[in-house]
Amino acid sequence: MPEIFLWTRAAIWAAALFALFVFVPNRHPRAARWDDPTLTHDLGAVTDVWARWDSVWFLRIAEHGYDAATGAASAFYPLYPAAVAVLGRAFFGHYVLAGIVISLAASFCAFVLLYELAEERLGADGARRAVLYL
């Protein structure tokens, strides 16, 4: 089961990097408003490809807390940003990397839980397929 997790995550990462290098130079000019270059770090495209869209809000909350002036950040639950804030400080300010590590750990836990639940009803083969389809 861990091999399914590793292969699927590697495939998603490869697809994201491919999209970054192929499509970003040709993207719509207003698409940049969803990116925040102040949140990216020296780890480059390997991690920054994931700092898009709602992750910008989560990273801002992790670094600076909830801003009462905008109020828009209140739409995001606090557990994930709090975990990113703690791990980000342990990673010396690499909040994007902390978010990736937390997201990977959470998805691995979801894989394990789904496997355990599916194994009871579907057997080992069915559980592996369920995890693969996740």
Q: Where are the language model's segments positioned?
A:
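Transmembrane alpha-helices of multi-pass, membrane-embedded glycan-processing enzymes
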Residues: 80, 84-88, 99-113
